């Protein structure tokens, strides 16, 4: 049995891509997208017609509506291939505006519903800022399920659990990147691999907290740099993996053992944690890595959203 099939015994495998033509070969349950992945996809010749068709069909509409229609078009194509859910991201430029995030999310869901898709097959991706988490709380209360992304800290995860969001995406690779850069020449790759990887440790701590305290929010590890990080999180509720790493897993027959387990998490001695807004902001501020990576991630997604807008305006 290859590693991909072995992993699927313990974990729901999700494909992290906008390149939906790659999906079928890996048979993922769900798929995730973001502005950067959509931007990358529409610059490929095989996907350029989707952008052109969207601009032509909805000519004269506001650019933000055209953007939403394009990402929903990609989402619909993905949902025609996979059996589960697709995650579609709200414009990252709204990351600090609760009301605007809610409004944009509702429009995205309405666009999916207009295509005949059930609301339960869509997760709205929102950056895990305080404002984003509060938007997710409101959306969940309205029956719209959310995926809180750009999650780098335990405090973000705790606040998401308190808000009863459907799913969180704690990032592994970007945490690894930060610590590796900080260590510089002193970084020991072998010593910091697997269970010692700081990104892996972050997800494990969040998973154990959720399962120990019976928090229903799903944990989907994201942002991987190598298959070792993925295998070290076998048993996590879900893992979203780029096609390149899915291919590496499919090509390897190395063993995959379950690492994360809800029963084991319940036996870990843990103290309950809760955050109000002030406590959340202070905890996030105290975590230099999470503060820097959250800000960097929002800037990057916002920049790619702006580039996508430029491509759409040029195609008009």
Swiss-Prot record:
Coiled coil: none annotated. Its EC number is 2.2.1.2. GO terms for cellular component: cytoplasm. Pathway: Carbohydrate degradation; pentose phosphate pathway; D-glyceraldehyde 3-phosphate and beta-D-fructose 6-phosphate from D-ribose 5-phosphate and D-xylulose 5-phosphate (non-oxidative stage): step 2/3. It is found in: Cytoplasm. The keyword Calcium does not apply. Keywords: Cytoplasm, Pentose shunt, Schiff base, Transferase. Transaldolase is important for the balance of metabolites in the pentose-phosphate pathway. This is Transaldolase. It comes from Acidovorax sp. (strain JS42).
């Amino acid at each position: 049995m290859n590693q991909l099939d072995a992993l699927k015994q313990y974990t729901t495998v999700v494909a992290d891509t906008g390149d939906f033509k790659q999906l079928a070969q890996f048979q993922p349950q769900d798929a995730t997208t973001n502005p950067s992945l959509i931007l990358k996809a529409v610059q490929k010749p095989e996907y350029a017609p989707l952008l052109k068709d969207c601009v032509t069909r909805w000519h004269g509409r506001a650019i933000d509506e055209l953007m939403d229609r394009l990402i929903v078009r990609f989402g619909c194509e993905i949902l025609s291939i996979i059996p589960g859910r697709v995650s579609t991201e709200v414009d990252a430029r709204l990351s600090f505006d609760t009301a605007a995030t809610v409004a944009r999310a509702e429009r995205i869901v309405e666009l999916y519903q207009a295509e005949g898709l059930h609301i339960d097959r869509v997760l709205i991706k929102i950056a895990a800022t305080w404002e984003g988490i509060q938007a997710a709380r409101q959306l969940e209360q309205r029956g719209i399920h959310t995926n809180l992304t750009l999650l780098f800290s335990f405090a973000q995860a705790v606040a998401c659990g308190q808000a009863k969001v459907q799913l969180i995406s704690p990032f592994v690779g970007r945490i690894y990147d930060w610590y590796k850069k900080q260590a510089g020449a002193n970084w020991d790759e072998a010593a910091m691999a697997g269970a010692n990887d700081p990104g892996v440790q972050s997800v494990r701590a969040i998973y154990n907290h959720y399962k120990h305290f019976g928090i229903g929010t799903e944990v989907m590890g994201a942002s991987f740099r190598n298959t070792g990080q993925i295998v070290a999180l076998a048993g996590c509720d879900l893992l979203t993996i780029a096609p390149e790493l899915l291919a590496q897993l499919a090509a390897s027959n190395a063993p995959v053992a379950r690492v994360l387990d809800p029963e084991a998490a319940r036996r870990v001695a843990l103290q309950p944690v809760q955050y109000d807004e002030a406590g959340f902001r202070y905890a996030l501020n105290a975590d230099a890595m999470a503060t820097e990576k959250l800000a960097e991630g929002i800037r990057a997604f916002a920049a790619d959203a702006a580039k996508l807008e430029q491509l759409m305006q040029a195609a008009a």
